[in-house]
Amino acid sequence: ETDTEAYICYGRIIFMKEELRIDIVGLAGACSYALDCIEAELVNITNKHGKRVAYISVCMAEYWAIQGEALQDLAMCALLHDNALTQYISEELKKDSVIDLKKDLSEEKTNLHCIYGEKNITKLPFKTDVSNVILYHHEHADGTGPFQKKWNEIPLFARIIHLADIIDIIRNSIDSDDNSWDFMCQYLSQNKDSLFDSECVNAFLHVFTKESFMCLSDDSFETKLWEAIPREKLVFDWEMCKDVADFFAKIVDYKSSFTSRHSIGVAEKASMLAQYMGYDSITVQKTVSYTHLRAHETKANL
């Protein structure tokens, strides 16, 4: 939703009203869908994986009475927990076009996409401190994860997302029948205090029943997810618009480094032109942001 109008007149971009209001959670949901499509294509992860991880995480949050801005930030982190997957894939494919991506992602280079992902989300407008949530979301409670951090060194949100992530991956790999809930409970019990900390295991078993767990196999969970998350539109300045566009660029452009360079190059040229024409710094930011956003909107519709 925007109260800003922009149009081009004789080579000049004219901006009207100043406010740009964006539903950042909805934007994260759209980004999650793009990531899911790529994961389904490359590593055979189930569709809507990010949204399921977010739903499981939001449900678990009830155990700690997490609400408001903190709940919104947890949902965003969960939706975008694998935001650097495409960036990592792109770099690995440049090195070796025949690598086994599924094996490579799961066994050897998990820490890289966590590092990239942590850096990427600094561009997004979180309301609370989410430092190290993405970085440590693959850590094990006993300290055997990629960074060898034990559960008491890991942010709660990272621990929640880690359990939710594994739950959905396992749920997708087993038959969805009457025995799947019992299998999951047994798995959590066997890996309590090793893969997962006992507090998160208790939280999951406290909020989920066999019936609610089985509902993860259909699309009804998505409606419940959006009902549970606070959805407040944020007023974006033009610098934030550019940061968000940069974040999307790393995902949308993973198959072609040219499209990424092209849209960034166009934005840079627009900035130079606006400065040459004597516009102030705010108008220059608007020009760059609008050009960036339009470029990615065009590519997303192709």
Task: Describe each model-derived feature in a short phrase.
Residues R52-A61, H113-I121, S180-K192, F196, ...:
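An active-site-proximal "capping" alpha-helix that borders the catalytic cofactor pocket
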Residues E1-F15:
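Short, Lys/Arg-enriched N-terminal segments with co-localized hydrophobic residues
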Residues K17-E18, L74-A78, I121-H162, S176-D177, ...:
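Histidine/acidic-rich helix-loop-helix segments that form or flank divalent-metal centers
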Residues R159-R171:
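Conserved beta-strand-loop-short alpha-helix elements that form
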Residues I24, E39, L80, F157, ...:
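Signal-transmission coiled-coils
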Residues T291-T298:
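Conserved small/polar residues in nucleotide/adenosyl-binding loops
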Residues V43-L74, E139, G145-E153, S256-T287:
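Alpha-helical phosphate/pyrophosphate-handling elements in metalloenzyme active cores
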Residues A30-H49, K95-L101, A245-R261:
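Active-site flanking loop/helix segments enriched in acidic
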